[in-house]
Regions:
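Short, charge-patterned binding micro-sites
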Residues: 1-9, 39-41
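Short glycine-/aliphatic-rich beta-strand segments at the starts of folded cytosolic domains
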Residues: 3-7, 48-59
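Helix N-cap motif at beta-to-alpha junctions
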Residues: 10-15, 61-63, 116-117
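Short amphipathic alpha-helices in soluble, non-transmembrane regions
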Residues: 15-26, 65-75, 125-129
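Acidic, low-complexity central loop/insert segments
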Residues: 23, 27-41
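Conserved loop-to-helix interface motifs that mediate assembly, gating, or partner/ligand docking
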Residues: 44-46
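A contiguous pocket-lining binding segment that forms or flanks enzyme active sites
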Residues: 52-85
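Core RNA-modification/binding signature centered on pseudouridine synthases
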Residues: 74-154
Length: 154
């Protein structure tokens, strides 16, 4: 999975030292992939995320997944409810494609969803809109897509 952490330090520390300290303090199963300094005048990193890409593995049979994905992609609207408020899921789907089955023969998709404030697509909504139970899937966020390239500080 892919997470982003935006940390403000009171004193300047070399990125290698920060990486090493985080690597020693992290819980088992979490990897620190990158430490990059950014100009503190820039917006918080979470506010410049444009989209998130998720892989979804269907643990139960999903023989008609191809047809359901095509129906979803060709739909003009996909009305849904979130916290009792109606919204259209379709414009939040930036990309949806089939992936090769995994080693156990489970069907998989890759979906890229909008991550704008007030317009964030959620993988469990895609799964439910396809007619499957979110509880019968494994979802992994593969990457974050940013609105802009954040220049390194310095």
């Amino acid at each position: 999975d892919c997470e982003l952490v935006d940390i403000r330090l009171e004193q300047e520390i070399k990125t290698e030292e920060i990486h090493q300290a985080l690597a020693q303090a992290k819980p088992h199963g979490i990897s620190i992939l990158e430490v990059t300094p950014v100009d503190e005048r820039l917006p918080a990193l979470q506010t410049v995320v444009e989209a998130s890409e998720f892989s979804v593995t269907f643990l139960d049979p999903a023989d008609d997944l191809d047809a359901r994905c095509l129906t979803m992609l060709t739909a003009e609207k996909l009305p849904r409810l979130w916290r009792s408020k109606p919204y259209d899921l379709r414009p939040l789907i930036l990309d949806l494609r089939l992936l090769p089955d995994d080693d156990q023969g489970h069907r998989r998709i890759l979906v890229t969803l909008s991550a704008h404030e007030g317009a964030t697509g959620r993988p469990e909504e895609i799964i439910a809109a396809l007619g499957y139970s979110p509880e019968s899937t494994r979802v992994h966020r593969e990457r974050l897509i940013f609105k802009l390239t954040v220049p390194a500080a310095g």
